[in-house]
Amino acid sequence: MRPRLLVSPVNRDEALEAVEGGAHIIDVKNPEEGSLGANFPWVIREIMEVVPEDREVSATVGDVPYKPGTVAQAVLGVAAVGVDYAKVGLYGTKTEEEALEVMRACSRAVREFGYDTRVVAAGYADAHRVGSLDPMSVPEVAAEAECDVAMVDTAVKDGKRLFDFLSEEEVGEFVDSAHEHGLEVALAGSLRHEDMPIVRDLGADIVGVRGAACERGDRNRGAIRSHLVRKLAEALA
């Protein structure tokens, strides 16, 4: 089965472009607040209103600190808006124990309040640049915390991509570990068009992009365009 393409718009117009281009998951984020920067609840709602029922919606809650209560409330907030996935960037957690505490709180918040939102634990391939936990530990943390998806992205958006920090073999090990724990796997990190067949063949369930779907490849100043999304979707086929 080919991976599902996740594209990250910042507003309604970009979301429509992503849908037209064939994105499977519309991922609401705010690049001005970081790699997994959180957008406003009303923006999430505006985007959800234009996404067809046969597509899914995810939302990031930020590159989060080691504050389990704060993060759990944020996850509960996006679950209440009605998204299919809540993505948590484990930015401020330096150890597996800290990450586990944060993600357990997130999973518990969603389940105890009766939502079926899937919880995504995201680590960073360039963790050494920001002092966060080893990304290779994320699948085990996600499984133990009863999350649904293990993800790896990049924290610093300076043009360097996932494979500048992890080899194809290491990414394959991440994918295999997550699958062995019964999790889905999402791969992201300034991925380019030419990376699509690689991440597909490594077994990713979800492939996340923003910059590659934007004009001039610029995730901050460029806008998502449907023809670029379509090329990425075709490259995953």
From Swiss-Prot:
EC number: 4.2.3.153
Functional note: Catalyzes the formation of 4-(hydroxymethyl)-2-furancarboxaldehyde phosphate (4-HFC-P) from two molecules of glyceraldehyde-3-P (GA-3-P).
Name of protein: (5-formylfuran-3-yl)methyl phosphate synthase
Keywords from the named record: Lyase, Schiff base
GO annotation (BP), single: methanofuran biosynthetic process
Taxonomic lineage from the root: Archaea, Methanobacteriati, Methanobacteriota, Methanomada group, Methanopyri
InterPro entries xrefs: 4HFCP_synth, 4HFCP_synth_arc, RibuloseP-bd_barrel
Pathway named in the protein's UniProt entry: Cofactor biosynthesis; methanofuran biosynthesis
Active-site residue numbers: 29 (schiff-base intermediate with substrate), 87 (proton acceptor)
Assigned protein family: Belongs to the MfnB family.
Alphabetical list of Pfam families matching this protein: 4HFCP_synth
Catalyzed reactions per annotation: 2 D-glyceraldehyde 3-phosphate = 4-(hydroxymethyl)-2-furancarboxaldehyde phosphate + phosphate + 2 H2O
GO-annotated molecular function: carbon-carbon lyase activity
Domain of life: Archaea
